[in-house]
């Protein structure tokens, strides 16, 4: 393959020297004027870089002025806890992140733990909900399907309780995976994650009138195969419904009129033929229906139902508190400073891909190859990143750059803002668009 031909790059200083506003528990960052260096895309030299890995015994707090879980492990003094956000930052160094993941959990005397699998059709809102539960946008989100390509893990730690979230790709059928040449992870990860689940959260997008009236067939298969795992139903995007009465009909259909072994008092007649049978909580259970029923549209073994908008903090907090109460006595799996199992480079690549899916039309974003060439600490302690975006067509180059370089600059700026919130440090990011010959 010939060497890629360099066209240009968007150069953005993402929120360098940003100021902090709002409460410490929920930080918000405002970019100072001029953080976007020019409207036109600028060419940059493509120097091959390497991942920077600072000394593990150097204080991350002194480098970036942030709380570091690694510092707590190594015994460095910490700032006043009242000045530290409740949600931990992710280290910008792969070695530090990996060390934290394998470190002995700093669990309390009576620890509690819960492993939660988020299950649903593509674009049901699983990653958005995961981000809201975690308090950080560590998982990629877009309106296009298959934004999440493989299983990702997030950790919520509050007091003596740890909740581990497994954000799975939208569940698909083997036929669709083969037809569209999708990764095996999209097919396998939702199923493998169920093997270690303590609770399943089934997410349904009620704004999609074409799919909302029945559970996804693959979701039903998964629930049936792992019927011993408790499950709850979450009706997402309820803010998009003009007629709230629709929620009653959907609840009746998706639960077959039964929640936690009790028949729902809903007058709307169920149209599913399988709804005529109402199992009792003691006489029957999920194992009685281990054989798949092709006519089934709902699952009568949900323990609870939640109706929410994943963008509404109050709604999400109600679900979060429920998850915390469902945790059972047991050892933690991770140190309290762990927010996600992803490496910092994976988070960055996913964030860039999220913006590509959001802003590029049709099939264009799916053909972009990403290659990180620089990941290092700058002279002022900022994180310096350069990623090359390789595209197969010259027309795609023009689309990605945008008029006068505005689109590539906007993408870089938004990615930088998100990364600054995740890493708690200043970010300088360069995106270089190249054509593959």
From Swiss-Prot:
Residues covered by region (G1): 120-127
Sites where the protein binds GTP: 120-127, 167-171, 236-239
GO cellular component terms, A-Z: cytosol; mitochondrial inner membrane; mitochondrial matrix
Xref: InterPro entries: G_ERA_dom, GTP-bd, GTPase_Era-like, KH_dom-like_a/b, KH_dom_type_2, KH_sf_prok-type, P-loop_NTPase, Small_GTP-bd
Pfam families named in the record: KH_2 (PF07650), MMR_HSR1 (PF01926)
Membrane topology per record: Peripheral membrane protein
Residue range of the transit peptide in the UniProt record, numbered on this chain: 1-20
Keyword Phosphoprotein part of the UniProt annotation: yes
Keywords (A to Z) from UniProt: GTP-binding, Membrane, Mitochondrion, Mitochondrion inner membrane, Nucleotide-binding, Phosphoprotein, Ribosome biogenesis, RNA-binding, rRNA-binding, Transit peptide
Similarity comment text for this entry: Belongs to the TRAFAC class TrmE-Era-EngA-EngB-Septin-like GTPase superfamily. Era GTPase family.
Region (G3): 167-170
Chain residue ranges for the region called G4: 236-239
Protein name (database record): GTPase Era, mitochondrial
Database matches in PANTHER family: GTPASE ERA (PTHR42698), GTPASE ERA, MITOCHONDRIAL (PTHR42698:SF1)
Start and end residues of each stretch annotated as Disordered: 270-292
One GO molecular-function entry: ribosomal small subunit binding
GO biological process, one term: ribosomal small subunit assembly
Region called G5, residue ranges: 308-310
Domain spans labelled KH type-2: 360-437
Chief location category: mitochondrion
Phosphoserine carried by residues: 173
Domain Era-type G intervals: 112-330
The organism of origin for this protein: Mus musculus
Compartment list: Mitochondrion matrix; Mitochondrion inner membrane
């Amino acid at each position: 393959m010939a060497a890629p031909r360099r066209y240009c790059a968007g150069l953005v200083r993402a929120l360098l020297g940003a100021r902090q506003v709002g409460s410490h528990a929920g930080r918000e960052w405002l970019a100072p004027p001029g953080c976007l260096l020019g409207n036109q895309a600028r060419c940059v030299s493509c120097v091959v870089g390497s991942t920077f890995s600072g000394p593990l015994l150097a204080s991350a707090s002194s480098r970036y002025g942030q709380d570091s879980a690694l510092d707590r492990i190594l015994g460095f003094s910490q700032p006043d806890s009242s000045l530290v956000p409740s949600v931990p930052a992710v280290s910008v160094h792969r070695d530090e992140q990996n060390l934290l993941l394998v470190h002995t959990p700093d669990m309390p005397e009576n620890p509690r733990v819960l492993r939660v699998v988020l299950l649903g059709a593509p674009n049901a809102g699983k990653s958005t909900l995961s981000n809201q539960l975690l308090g950080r946008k560590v998982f990629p989100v877009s309106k296009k399907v298959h934004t999440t390509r493989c299983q990702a893990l997030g950790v919520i730690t509050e007091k003596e309780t740890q909740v581990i979230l497994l954000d799975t790709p939208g569940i698909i059928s083997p036929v669709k995976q083969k037809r569209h040449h999708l990764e095996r992870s999209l097919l396998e990860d939702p199923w493998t994650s169920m093997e270690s689940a303590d609770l399943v959260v089934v997410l349904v997008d009620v704004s999609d009138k074409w799919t909302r009236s029945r559970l996804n067939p693959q979701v039903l298969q998964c629930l049936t195969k792992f019927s011993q795992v408790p499950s709850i139903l979450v009706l997402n995007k309820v803010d998009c419904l003009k007629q709230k009465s629709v929620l009653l009909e959907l609840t009746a259909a998706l639960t077959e009129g039964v929640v936690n072994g009790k028949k729902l008092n809903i007058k709307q007649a169920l149209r599913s033929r399988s709804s005529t049978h109402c199992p009792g909580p003691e006489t029957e259970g999920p194992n009685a229906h281990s054989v798949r029923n092709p006519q089934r549209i709902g699952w009568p073994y949900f323990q609870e139902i939640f109706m929410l908008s994943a963008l509404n903090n109050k709604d999400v907090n109600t679900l979060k508190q429920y998850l915390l109460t469902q945790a059972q006595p047991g050892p933690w799996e991770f140190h309290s400073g762990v927010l996600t199992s992803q490496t910092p480079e994976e988070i960055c690549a996913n964030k860039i891909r999220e913006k590509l899916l959001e802003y590029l039309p049709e099939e264009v974003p799916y053909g972009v190859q990403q290659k990180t060439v620089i990941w290092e600490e700058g002279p002022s302690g900022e994180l310096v990143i350069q990623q090359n975006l390789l595209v197969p067509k010259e027309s795609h180059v023009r689309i990605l750059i945008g008029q006068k370089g505005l689109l590539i600059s906007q993408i870089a700026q938004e990615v930088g803002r998100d990364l600054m919130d995740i890493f708690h440090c200043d970010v300088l990011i360069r995106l270089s668009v190249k054509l593959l010959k």
